[in-house]
Amino acid sequence: MKRLYRYTASVLAAAFCLSAVLSFPSFAAVEERNLTPEDRYYMDIQSNSWENWPAGPQVYAESAIVMEASTGTILYAKNIDDQHYPASITKIMTVLLALENCDLDEEVVFSHNAVYSIDYASSHIARDEGEILTVEECLYAILLESANECSNAIAEHIAGTTEAFAEMMNERAAELGCTNTHFANPHGLPDENHYTSAHDMALILQEVVKHETFRRISGSANYTLRATNLKDEELLMNNHHYMISAYKTSRFLDDTVFAGKTGYTTVALNTLVTCATRNGMDLLCVTMKTQGSGEQGVPLYTDTANLLDYAGQNFQKINISQNETNFTINQNELFSTGSSFFENTTPMIELDDSGYVVLPAGVDFSAASPQLEFVDGDDEVIATLTYSFAGQEVGSTDLLMTGTDIQEFNFQKIDGGEEGEEQSAAAGENDAQVRLVKINLRIVGVVAAVIILLIVLILVLRKFSGNFSVEWNFIRRWRRKRSARNAFGNQNRIRYRSRKRRRKFNWKFWEK
């Protein structure tokens, strides 16, 4: 009997454990590879295998990416989708959510959990429970000093708890297209369920650089924090990014760098995000899992410097609307006659002039292949043109309904290239053709006025023609009556003359 009880208890315990395991979500484990710096240095660079693409430099980072911010074009790719622990570059997402959900002057009160849930040996600025900072001051502390308690305080200020804030982080990451990311906290301290990839971090960085506040704060070399309700003294905070601030060395200072964030833990090794403007391009560089050499900033910053030099020297940014010929709308044509009626006006449809492509230096714009995709349900955007080169997307722009004065009747064939032909073939056509209509309102007004006058004239003529018909019928009846009277009169005259002759010759001559 006891043996039966033990058996039953074992089964129930096993079932309980199994249900407990199944009830918790599973997360992808970060693959740990025991690699030396030399092993990482000689790992394959995927972008170097792209046809007609400039060869990029070898770097010591296990994963690295360079992306152009406005187009999303990937210029350099090395293991960009591998999952890694991000360390403090996590705070880029924390700052993004703060900028999207807070005003800078909002007051943030530090809770007990925000201050004391972090390891005291980690990055912080020694805030106390109950201390009050503004959102802006917290952002300076997060981006310059990588303050973990400030990250916690911002998270609780926005979502109530750091756990709820982590859910917001994951939702926002998914919206940005991140596929290899899961956040577990707002600061980046080690957690096996807290990971991302170089590509995903570049997507997050691409979004946050749209905020001028991020550029201003992250690009500051230092910031003086005022005295607070619990601190009587000011605090000078320094940016830990060596390309922005001479925090420990001036060797890597670069005036083209406008933002960045550092990260380090023993499991993540060095991580770094850097934003720089080179050759008219905003370049976003992310390196992950870089092992230090013992020399200050090497190879972490030498890798980034080499990648920024490579991108700035080997690529060019080209405006689409200024170079696109297949989709150009000619403003001086009226039914392809080359004449303009009254004056030139804004076309009904035009290419968005803010669209760009990024191509290797020396490559002509015509080498990029456009693909046209129509957009439904948008009052302004009619279609999107996406360009590719060497099998990679290199930029896009929108075809817009201007909503202003409409120009000329112009039916112009648009050739969308090979990809456009394939798209049209799928729709049962032989080639990709789009006919655009431009209308001059003055012409429409003149034509409409002429049509109205013609209609009025026709109505008037119909009215007069009706009166004329009545008069004509009267005349015809009068003529018939007159003819009848004449005929009757003629008959009477004939009879009269006949009687007169008879009278003339019918006298009795013998009576004389």
Task: Kindly give the residue locations of the regions a language model identified.
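Bacterial N-terminal signal peptides that target proteins for export
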Residues: 1-12
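Active-site-adjacent loops and short helices of periplasmic peptidoglycan-processing enzymes
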Residues: 3, 28-199, 203-217
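C-terminal segment of classical bacterial N-terminal signal peptides
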Residues: 17-27
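N-terminal hydrophobic targeting segments that direct proteins to the cell envelope
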Residues: 26-44, 421-431, 466-479
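Alpha-helical transmembrane segments
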Residues: 450-467
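Cytoplasmic C-terminal tails of single-pass
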Residues: 465-512
